[in-house]
């Protein structure tokens, strides 16, 4: 990670833009409060109590009762230290709190139903392999014997090095070669409770062969393809066509094969999984019932299973709607735990088999809440910004007739004719462009006409705001008129799921939340890619096309993208060679105070370039050779060469994102 920069970077203050009366997206409500902002951005619905809007209009982290810290204050402290943005804020207390919340939910259900077994969670590190995340989960889960799950050799090597409770599970999932299996078996000799999951039938003989060669008795689990499927975007992960797992015939063959080897007692776990982010609790109950019946069937076949692993899928309510929408979930963690415990117990009692240790592989639900991506707004563009007053004055006789027609449309818009006015404006704009292409309209008239068109749309938008019925052709008007807030980040690096699968994340300003937002906006990143934009935002009833934001002023304006701790850290791509962003690990203290315990600087430009096969000395030599040639041609002086090489070297060692001098 990068060393500290020599200069002091700051987020640039935004220019104050001139606006006509028609550019305000919402009528100003002078009684707007922090409570209104909390409702507007749905903070109580998605935050789970880990974040809140304060009475002073600040977004705060609230990792425990009585603890709170302003995110704006944390970011200001980072900037004051001379560090660069963007940055991810990590709250280990929130992460530890999520581990506790999950385990206590299952324990409460076990107590309520007098369940004779117990619960052991497993964290699949593929969700976030960052050291701070894995070590925090392992430490917070130690007293609960909360384990880890690895799906590759690299992940297994990482997991084996962690300090874990002796009873904590280390589940080895995914496809395996001999090296993977050997490493897992060596883990058992280290005292780790390693269980190797059979994902396909042919893996069984590999496991038996390596176990005999090493003289280590394996503990084996078997993944079963449930007929039941999940809900939401990952529904296809389950069912008969699932990527992983054995069918019923293969499951029974595993039992027979282990009997032949006199090793049936090595089969300790049944593993099932119906997909990530399950939105509907009914799907969970159906799947758990099928899994429990399968468990009972294996017991009847002679297996002495200890664990029933119901897999992952515990969701996160990203939009706060508490529905079966793909970005939500219609249940709580408490309900999830209670339904699993109750269903397993009901089946076991009916089939008269022992109640197993219940295992779940929850990752998203543990990690999502702990991380916030800070998005510095560096500029704003939009169809109604930077319009000069004279552009909306009465066109002169030298203006083309089409421009004068558009001005007349603007002047005469009313509730009675706004639809007709809109259609006239659309037609006039098309005519304007056609005439320009033919050379009959000047560039100045085109600029006036486009400004008038945008003013017409803005006026119509104000007229129909709050109307119960809006004509179909005007439904997207707000999106068309929206500002584009340019944010200093890469969507592909830091919000990859938004780009790849349309995932929604709550986005909220860090401060000014006791002021009513007056702009409707979409967000764009700083990559040279048209896909680098956020145009869908959470809403209680639907997906919003725009996000209400404030007019930026002289003070830097920051947005927070919340629930960022699951998958985003590990799925990001190096598009345009934008690297991993910096991260601050923050502990919240009493009295609104906080400590930045660790600051990890984001990736250097040099590191990103070297990842593509280049070497820094080679690059420096190439630039120096070109500079020497330029001196020979007389286009560069020796003094300029020194400055050029210094600047080039400084940028190689610098952050890949935009930096501004204070």
UniProtKB/Swiss-Prot annotation:
Residue numbers binding substrate: 308-318
UniProt keyword terms in alphabetical order: Decarboxylase, Lyase, Magnesium, Metal-binding, Polyamine biosynthesis, Pyridoxal phosphate, Spermidine biosynthesis
Modification sites for N6-(pyridoxal phosphate)lysine: 126
Gene3D superfamilies recorded: 1.20.58.930, Alanine racemase, Lyase, Ornithine Decarboxylase, Chain A, domain 1
Reaction catalysis annotation: L-arginine + H(+) = agmatine + CO2
InterPro entries listed in its UniProt record: Ala_racemase/Decarboxylase_C, Arg_decarb_HB, Arg_decarbox_C, Arg_decrbxlase, De-COase2_N, De-COase2_pyr-phos_BS, Orn/DAP/Arg_de-COase, PLP-binding_barrel
The EC number(s) this enzyme carries: 4.1.1.19
GO molecular function: arginine decarboxylase activity; metal ion binding
Enzyme class: lyase
Known role: Catalyzes the biosynthesis of agmatine from arginine.
Entry-linked PANTHER family: ARGININE DECARBOXYLASE (PTHR43295), BIOSYNTHETIC ARGININE DECARBOXYLASE (PTHR43295:SF9)
Family assignment from sequence similarity: Belongs to the Orn/Lys/Arg decarboxylase class-II family. SpeA subfamily.
Protein name: Biosynthetic arginine decarboxylase
Source organism (scientific name): Deinococcus radiodurans (strain ATCC 13939 / DSM 20539 / JCM 16871 / CCUG 27074 / LMG 4051 / NBRC 15346 / NCIMB 9279 / VKM B-1422 / R1)
Encoding gene per record: speA
């Amino acid at each position: 990670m990068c060393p500290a920069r020599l200069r002091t970077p700051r987020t640039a203050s935004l220019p104050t833009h001139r606006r006509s009366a028609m550019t305000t997206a919402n009528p100003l409500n002078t009684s707007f409060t922090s409570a209104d902002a909390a409702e507007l951005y749905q903070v109580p619905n998605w935050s789970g109590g880990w974040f809140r809007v304060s009475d002073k209009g600040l977004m705060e982290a609230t990792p425990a009762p009585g603890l709170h810290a302003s995110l704006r204050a944390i970011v200001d402290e980072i900037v004051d230290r001379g560090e660069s943005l963007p940055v991810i804020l990590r709250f280990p207390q929130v992460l530890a709190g999520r581990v506790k919340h999950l385990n206590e939910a299952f324990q409460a259900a076990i107590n309520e139903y007098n369940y004779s077994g117990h619960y052991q969670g497993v964290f699949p590190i593929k969700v976030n392999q960052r050291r701070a995340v894995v070590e925090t989960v392992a430490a917070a889960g130690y007293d609960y014997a909360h384990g880890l799950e690895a799906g590759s050799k690299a992940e297994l090597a990482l997991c084996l090095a962690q300090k874990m409770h002796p009873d904590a599970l280390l589940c080895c999932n995914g496809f395996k070669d001999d090296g993977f299996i050997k490493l897992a078996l060596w883990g058992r000799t280290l005292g780790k409770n390693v269980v190797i999951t059979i994902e396909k039938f042919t893996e069984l003989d590999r496991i038996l062969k390596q176990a005999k060669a090493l003289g280590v008795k394996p503990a084996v689990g078997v993944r079963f393809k449930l007929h039941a499927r999940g809900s939401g975007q990952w529904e296809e992960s389950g069912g008969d066509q699932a990527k992983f797992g054995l069918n019923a015939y293969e499951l029974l063959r595993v039992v027979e094969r282990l009997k032949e080897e006199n090793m049936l007692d090595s089969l300790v776990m049944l593993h099932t999984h119906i997909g990530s982010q399950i939105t509907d609790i009914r799907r969970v109950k159906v799947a758990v019932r099928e899994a429990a019946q399968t468990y009972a069937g294996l017991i009847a076949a002679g297996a002495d299973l200890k664990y029933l692993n119901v897999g992952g899928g515990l969701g996160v309510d990203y939009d706060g709607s508490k529905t079966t929408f793909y970005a939500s979930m219609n249940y709580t963690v408490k309900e999830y735990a209670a339904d699993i415990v109750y269903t397993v117990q009901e089946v076991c009692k009916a089939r008269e088999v022992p109640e197993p240790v219940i295992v779940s592989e929850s990752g998203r639900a543990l990690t999502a809440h702990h991380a916030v991506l800070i998005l510095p707004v560096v500029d704003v563009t939009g169809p109604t910004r930077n319009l000069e007053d004279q552009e909306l004055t009465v066109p002169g006789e030298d203006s083309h007739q089409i421009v004068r027609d558009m001005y007349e449309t603007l002047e005469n818009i009313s509730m009675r004719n706004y639809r007709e006015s809109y259609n006239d404006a659309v037609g006039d704009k098309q005519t304007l462009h056609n005439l320009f292409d033919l050379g009959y309209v000047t560039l100045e008239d085109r600029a006036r006409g486009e400004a008038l068109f945008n003013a017409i749309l803005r006026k119509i938008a104000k007229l129909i705001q709050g109307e119960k019925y809006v004509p179909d052709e005007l439904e997207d008007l707000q999106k068309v008129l929206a500002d584009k807030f340019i944010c200093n980040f890469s969507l592909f690096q830091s919000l990859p799921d938004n780009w790849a699968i349309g995932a929604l994340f709550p986005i909220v300003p860090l401060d000014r939340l006791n002021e009513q937002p007056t702009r409707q906006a979409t967000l764009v990143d700083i990559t040279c890619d048209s896909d680098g934009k956020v145009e869908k935002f959470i809403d209680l009833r639907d997906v919003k096309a725009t996000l209400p934001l404030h007019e930026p002023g002289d003070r830097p304006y920051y947005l927070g993208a919340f629930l960022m701790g699951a998958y985003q850290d590990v799925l990001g791509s190096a598009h345009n060679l934008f690297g991993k962003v910096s991260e601050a690990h923050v502990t919240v203290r009493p009295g609104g105070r906080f400590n930045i315990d660790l600051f990890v600087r984001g990736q250097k430009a040099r590191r990103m370039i070297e990842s593509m096969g280049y070497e820094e000395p080679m690059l420096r030599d190439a630039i120096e050779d070109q500079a020497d040639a330029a001196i020979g041609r007389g286009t560069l002086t020796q003094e300029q060469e020194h400055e050029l090489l210094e600047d080039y070297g400084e940028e190689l060692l610098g952050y890949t994102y935009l930096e501004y001098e204070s």
